[in-house]
From Swiss-Prot:
GO terms for biological process: protoporphyrinogen IX biosynthetic process; uroporphyrinogen III biosynthetic process. Coiled coil: none annotated. It comes from Bacillus subtilis (strain 168). The gene is hemD. InterPro entries: 4pyrrol_syn_uPrphyn_synt_sf, 4pyrrol_synth_uPrphyn_synth, UROS/Hem4. This is Uroporphyrinogen-III synthase. PANTHER family: UROPORPHYRINOGEN-III SYNTHASE, CHLOROPLASTIC. Belongs to the uroporphyrinogen-III synthase family. The keyword Lyase applies. It is an enzyme of class 4 (lyase). Disulfide bonds: none annotated. Keywords: Lyase, Porphyrin biosynthesis. Catalyzes cyclization of the linear tetrapyrrole, hydroxymethylbilane, to the macrocyclic uroporphyrinogen III. The keyword Zinc-finger does not apply.
Length: 262
């Protein structure tokens, strides 16, 4: 049946980081669509080895480790391994969402707190309810991550530390691939999974995207922050109810089915 492949005949531009884009591509193709991959950003470690002793001391203290992304989890455990550090069993763990929690589980780490809505504001609210006075809250983050948790919790008397584990940089190879793809395909959907991909895309092909939208291309944002980033360039987008890749896919399927009914 046609409904078994709601993205049949649709071309989806995936601007996600290369390491994380494969599953997105597979899901688009399983729904009958064609996915074109252009990795616009990549990541590199930012926390130097010469602070390993301070990290060891922070890990030994009672309190929370807060993971706001899969990248944060990956770079954290890579750092521990390289510096022969161990995550103490007494540490409480908070994760921003399901994917981050699943990645932590791969490292045999269970999550104590996870908000129902996968954004930093909701994670901060959850920590307010579960953290106790005297506990240090240490946030694993990237250089472009917001400091919502610190802003929300410090005024309440919590000690909040931030470890900048990784930094986001443009993927020059992916940017060239984007330029090539723009000349080869017409896109039904352009997907954005972070504000940084929005800014990189708009720097490279901002005017082209406006033309694509005028011709019927729809932009799909993973969540409100990414949506807001597009709005700063005058670009409107559609955002799923659930701020995940699966939510984006469900939204595109729904839009495609609605288009068929018109």
């Amino acid at each position: 049946m046609e409904n078994d492949f709601p993205l049949k005949g649709k071309t989806v531009l995936v601007t996600r980081n290369k390491a994380q884009a494969a599953s997105f591509q597979q899901k688009v193709e399983a729904l009958g669509g064609k996915a074109v991959l252009t990795s616009l950003i990549t990541f590199r470690r930012a926390l130097p080895n010469d602070v390993a002793e301070q990290v060891r001391e922070d890990l030994a203290a009672p309190g929370w480790l807060v993971f706001t992304s899969v990248n944060g989890a990956d770079f954290f455990f890579s750092y521990l391994k390289e510096n022969q550090l161990i995550l103490p069993a007494h540490k409480k763990i908070a994760a921003v969402g399901e994917k981050t929690a699943r990645r932590l589980k791969m490292h045999n780490v269970s999550v104590d707190v996870m908000p129902q809505e996968y954004i930093a504001e909701q994670l901060a609210d959850a920590l307010k309810q579960h953290a106790e006075p005297g506990e240090t809250i240490t946030v694993m983050k990237g250089n472009l991550s917001r400091d919502v948790i610190k802003q929300e919790l410090v005024p309440l008397g919590f000690e909040v530390k931030e470890w900048v584990l990784y930094e986001t940089i443009p993927d020059e190879e992916g940017i060239e691939a984007l330029k090539d793809a723009a000349g080869q395909y017409s896109f039904d959907y352009v997907t954005f999974t972070s504000s940084s991909t929005v800014h990189t895309f708009m720097h490279v092909l901002g005017e082209e995207l406006k033309k694509w939208k005028a011709n019927g291309t729809a932009c799909i944002s993973i969540g409100p922050l990414t949506n807001d980033a597009l709005l700063t360039y005058g670009i409107t987008s559609h955002t799923p109810d659930t701020f995940t890749i699966d939510g984006m896919l469900e939204l595109m399927c729904s839009m495609s089915r609605e288009e068929e009914r018109i």
